[in-house]
Regions:
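Extended, charge-rich alpha-helical scaffold/interaction domains
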Residues: 1-812
Length: 812
C-alpha cells in the first residue's frame, strides 16, 4: 500500500490533461537546451517520469522532446542522473525509440547499458534487437580497453536470450561459448590495480597488485571464482563474475536437445560415448566442441565453489555469498548432469559430501532444495539412496523454519515443480502434509495461489480424511506456531516480556507451556500424518486458543481455508470410492459444529460444506441411507438451526431429494417415517406461536425447505400424508402471528403461506404429488419435480393452479 501523499501524486500524474502535459514537455525541452543542468531540470524530468510511468498505456510525448532525450541518453558527457531519467522516460513513452536508438550504438559502457535497456523494453520482435545483438557480439569478439562495453555485454545478452532464445545462430552460440570458457576459467589471479594517496607532498601512486585471497584470508592457490576476495578486481575478473551469473540461463537455453547447435545432435551414440570419456579428462577438454567444453569448465567451476564454501568466512556478507554460490553451483551441476549423464558419477561424491556437511545446519536450509532436486533427478542413475535427503527436507525444514518467507516460497516451488515425481518416488511426501502446510499457516496471504495448485498432489486415499481435518484446523495451526515462536523467544521466568505481549497472548503462552495441554499442541504441530488423535479434544484446544482468534495472522489464515476446501472437495470427489464418500459425509456433519471461533470463519466454512454436501449426495445418493443414523441425529436437533442454518437447510434438502427407494432399495417405509417424524417435530417446535415468543431467528427459506421435504417424504409413504397435511395447515397461523409479521417481510410471509397451500393441495392427489415431488434417478435434463432450496418447481405450481380452478372436483 502506498502512503496517502504518494497516492495523491500518482493520482495527479494519471489525471493530467493532454494540453497541460504538452505545455510541461515544452518547458522541459527548453530546460534541456540550457548549458548548465539545474535542479529544476532534474525535478521536471522526475515529474515527467512519474507521469509516463503512472499509467498502463504509453503516453505520447512531442517528437522534438523525445529526440532531445535520446541525445541526452547517448551522450557520455551528460550527468548520469540525466541519463537514468531519460532512459526511464523514453522507455515508457510513445512513439517507440527502438529503431532510432539502434542506428548508432555507443561504445561507452554506461551509455550503452541505458540505451540497451530502452531497446529491450520496446522491442516487438527479434528483428528489433538484432542490431543490438550484432553490436554485442562484435564487442565480445574484439579486445576492448577497460571501461568499454564488454563489462556490460553479458547482462544485456542474458536478458536478450531470455526473451529471444532463437536469435543466435550456431556459430554465434559457439562464439559466446568459447568466450564464456575463457572468462570462467582463465581470469587473472592478481587483484586489480588501485590508486592510493601518496601523502601531503606527493601525488597518488599505484599500489602493486596483491594476490587474491579466499574468504578465510588464505591466499588463493587455484583459479579465480566469485568467492575469491580482493580490494579491487580486473576486467577479466568482473567478466568471470558476470559469466557465472548467466551460465545457468545459458545452459538451459543452448545446452539442451533440439537447440540451434546441431553439431552434438548429429553425433552417433558411439561418438557421444567417446566425447563423454574425453570430457572426463580435464587435460583433453580443448579437444571438445565449444558447448561441451563450456559444460566441462562450468562443472569444474562449480566443484571449486563448493570446496570454497567449506571455508570459514571472515565476514558475514561472505557467508551469505557462500550460501548463494552453493545453491547456484548445485543447480548448474544438475543441469549439466541432465545433459550428459557421465557427469553424474563425478558429481555425486561432491554432492553427498556437501549434504553431509550442511544437513544439520539450519542456516543452510535453502541449499537443501537444489541438493534434493539433484537427488531426485539423478539418484536412480547413480543407484544412490535418497530417502534420508527427503526425510530431512520434509521434516526438519518446515517444522523449524516455517517463519522464513524465502525458504517457504522456494520450498513450495520445489514441490510444485516435482509434484508428480514426488508422489511416485518419495514415500514421505504425502505423509508430510502437516509439515508442508505450516508454511501456508504462517505465510497464508503470500502463498495461497501456490497451495491451491499444490494441494491436489497431497491428497492420498489413506490420508485424505486427516488432510481435511488439517485444512479445517489451519487457523489453529497458525495460532500454535505463533505461540511456539513466542515461547522460544521468551523464557518462562521473564514475566515482564510475557506481559508486554498482552494479557490474552500471555494466557495462551501459559497454556502452551502447561504439561496437561502438551498432547494437544503436539498433535496440532505434528510433523507427519497418522500421529495422535484427530479431534477427540479439539473443542478444548479451541477454548485454549480463543484469545488468539483475533490475531491478524490467524484471521488471514482463516480466510484461505474456504478456498482450499473447494480445491480439496473438487479433487477428492473425482477419485473417492464409496467408503471415502461415507467418511467425508461424517466429517461434514461432525466438523460443522467443531470449528475455531473466528469472525465469519464458521459461516464461510459451512457455506462450502453446504455446496459439497449436495455434490457428494448427487454422486452417491445411497449416502443418505448409509449414514441415516448420523443424519437423523443431526436433522432432529433444532439447535443446529440456530448455529448453522445454511448447512442444516442443505441437509434437510438432500434428505428430501435422495431418501427414496428410487435411489436405494434399502430405503424402507420405517426409515422414511422416522425422518418424517423427526423433521415434523423440528418444524412444529420452531413454528410454535406464543404471545411471549421472540421473533424467529431463522430465515423463511428454512421453513419452505422443511415443508417441501416433509411433503416429498409423505409421497413416498402415503400413510404420512394426513399428518403432514395437518402440520402444513398450521403454517398460515404461524406466518400471520405478531412476532413473525414483525420479523419477516410481507413477501416472505406470503411465500410461506403459498407454499403450504400448494403442498396441501398437491397432497390431496397422491399420484400427482408423487410425479411432481418424487426424484427421477435418470435424466440429466430438465425435471418437473426438481426443487431449488427456496422455491417450488414450475410443475408443482401448474398442478396447484389446476386444483384451484377445479376445486369442486377435488375429493373431500
Amino acid at each position: 500500500m502506498y502512503a496517502a501523499a504518494t497516492e495523491s501524486l500518482i493520482k495527479q500524474a494519471r489525471e493530467i490533461k493532454e494540453e497541460e502535459l504538452q505545455r510541461f514537455c515544452g518547458r522541459i525541452f527548453k530546460l534541456l537546451h540550457a548549458k548548465d543542468v539545474s535542479g529544476d531540470t532534474v525535478d521536471s524530468l522526475q515529474r515527467l517520469n512519474l507521469i509516463v510511468s503512472a499509467t498502463k498505456y504509453a503516453r505520447e510525448l512531442p517528437s522534438d522532446l523525445v529526440m532531445k532525450l535520446q541525445m541526452v541518453l547517448r551522450s557520455s558527457s551528460c550527468p548520469e542522473q540525466l541519463q537514468v531519467l531519460s532512459s526511464s522516460i523514453v522507455r515508457e513513452s510513445f512513439p517507440p525509440s527502438v529503431h532510432s536508438l539502434s542506428s548508432d550504438l555507443s561504445h561507452d559502457s554506461r551509455t550503452f547499458s541505458y540505451v540497451a535497456s530502452v531497446i529491450l523494453a520496446q522491442a516487438g520482435n527479434k528483428e528489433d534487437v538484432m542490431p543490438l545483438c550484432h553490436h554485442l557480439l562484435k564487442s565480445l569478439e574484439s579486445r576492448l580497453s577497460d571501461g568499454e562495453i564488454s563489462k556490460h555485454a553479458l547482462p544485456i545478452l542474458s536478458k536478450m536470450i531470455t526473451v529471444y532464445p532463437e536469435m543466435l545462430t550456431d556459430d554465434q552460440v559457439n562464439l559466446v561459448s568459447r568466450k564464456l570458457v575463457d572468462w570462467l576459467r582463465y581470469a587473472s589471479m592478481q587483484q586489480g590495480a588501485s590508486m592510493t594517496s601518496g601523502g601531503f607532498f606527493s601525488g597518488p601512486r599505484t599500489r602493486q597488485p596483491a594476490p587474491l585471497t579466499e574468504v578465510d584470508g588464505v591466499v588463493t592457490g587455484d583459479f579465480f571464482t566469485v568467492l575469491c576476495v580482493g580490494q579491487s578486481y580486473t576486467e577479466d575478473q568482473w567478466m568471470n563474475m558476470y559469466t557465472f551469473s548467466m551460465i545457468k540461463n545459458w545452459l538451459l537455453t543452448y545446452d539442451t536437445d533440439g537447440t540451434t547447435n546441431t553439431e552434438s545432435d548429429d553425433r552417433s551414440e558411439v561418438d557421444s560415448s567417446v566425447m563423454s570419456m574425453v570430457s572426463a579428462t580435464s587435460s583433453s577438454s580443448r579437444l571438445l566442441p565449444p558447448k561441451e567444453r563450456l559444460r566441462e569448465k562450468a562443472f569444474e567451476y562449480c566443484q571449486r565453489l563448493i570446496e570454497q564454501s567449506d571455508r570459514k568466512a571472515l565476514k558475514k556478507t561472505d557467508t551469505e555469498l557462500q550460501k548463494a554460490c552453493i545453491v547456484e553451483s548445485v543447480s548448474i551441476m544438475d543441469i549439466i548432469c541432465g545433459e550428459d549423464p557421465s557427469y553424474v558419477y563425478r558429481a555425486f561424491p561432491c554432492i553427498k559430501a556437501l549434504y553431509g556437511r550442511l544437513h544439520g545446519d539450519l542456516a543452510y536450509a535453502r541449499a537443501l532444495l537444489p541438493i534434493a532436486q539433484f537427488y531426485l533427478n539423478h539418484s536412480e542413475t547413480a543407484a544412490v539412496d535418497s530417502d534420508a535427503v527427503f526425510c530431512q527436507l520434509f521434516s526438519q525444514c518446515p517444522a523449524e523454519q516455517f517463519n522464513e518467507p524465502m525458504l517457504a516460497f522456494e520450498f513450495v516451488q520445489f514441490c510444485l515443480l516435482n509434484a508428480s515425481v514426488l508422489q511416485d518416488r518419495v514415500a514421505n511426501y504425502r505423509q508430510s502434509f502437516p509439515n508442508i502446510l505450516k508454511f501456508l499457516a504462517w505465510n497464508s496471504s503470500g502463498l495461497i495461489a501456490e497451495y491451491v495448485e499444490l494441494l491436489p498432489s497431497l491428497i492420498a486415499p489413506d490420508t485424505a480424511i486427516e488432510l481435511l481435518h488439517t485444512i479445517l484446523d489451519l487457523p489453529c495451526l497458525a495460532a500454535a506456531l505463533d505461540l511456539q515462536q513466542r515461547s522460544a523467544c521468551y523464557q518462562a521466568s521473564d514475566r515482564t516480556m510475557w506481559d508486554q505481549q498482552g494479557a490474552k497472548v500471555a494466557a495462551c503462552l501459559e497454556a502452551f507451556r502447561q504439561p496437561s495441554y502438551r498432547g494437544l499442541f503436539l498433535y496440532i504441530l505434528r510433523p507427519e500424518a497418522g500421529t495422535g488423535d484427530t479431534i477427540d479434544r479439539l473443542k478444548m484446544l479451541h477454548e485454549i486458543l480463543a484469545d488468539m482468534a483475533e490475531s491478524p495472522r490467524v484471521v488471514r489464515c482463516a480466510q484461505v481455508v474456504p478456498v482450499l476446501l473447494h480445491v480439496y472437495f473438487n479433487t477428492i470427489t473425482q477419485k473417492a470410492d464409496e467408503k471415502m464418500m461415507n467418511q467425508l459425509l461424517l466429517v461434514l456433519l461432525e466438523r460443522s459444529s467443531l470449528l475455531y471461533n473466528i469472525k465469519t470463519f464458521n459461516f464461510e466454512v459451512q457455506k462450502v460444506f453446504s455446496t459439497h454436501l449436495q455434490a457428494l449426495c448427487k454422486l452417491h445418493p445411497p449416502l443418505i441411507v448409509d449414514q441415516s443414523r448420523e443424519i437423523l441425529d443431526f436433522a432432529s436437533s433444532p439447535a443446529n438451526i440456530y448455529s448453522k442454518e445454511d448447512f442444516y437447510t442443505h441437509v434437510v434438502w438432500v434428505i428430501g431429494e435422495y431418501l427414496s427407494v428410487s435411489y436405494d432399495p434399502r430405503c424402507t417405509v420405517e426409515l422414511i417415517t422416522s425422518f418424517c417424524e423427526s423433521l415434523e417435530a423440528v418444524l412444529f417446535e420452531i413454528t410454535q406461536v406464543r404471545q411471549s415468543a421472540s421473533p424467529p431467528s431463522f430465515s423463511p427459506r428454512l421453513i419452505t425447505v422443511l415443508m417441501t421435504t416433509l411433503a416429498k417424504l409423505a409421497t413416498r409413504s402415503q400413510d404420512l400424508i394426513p399428518r403432514v397435511s395437518l402440520c402444513l395447515s398450521k403454517m398460515r397461523t404461524f406466518a400471520r402471528s405478531g412476532p413473525v409479521m414483525a420479523c419477516y417481510s410481507e413477501e416472505d410471509t406470503e411465500e410461506i403461506i403459498t407454499r403450504a397451500h400448494e403442498l396441501i393441495n398437491l397432497l390431496k392427489l397422491p399420484n400427482v404429488a408423487q410425479f411432481v415431488l418424487a426424484p427421477s434417478v435418470g435424466g440429466d435434463g430438465p425435471r418437473w419435480h426438481r426443487d431449488t432450496n427456496a422455491s417450488l418447481p414450475q410443475g408443482m405450481r401448474a398442478v396447484s393452479g389446476l386444483l384451484h380452478r377445479h376445486s369442486s372436483f377435488l375429493p373431500t
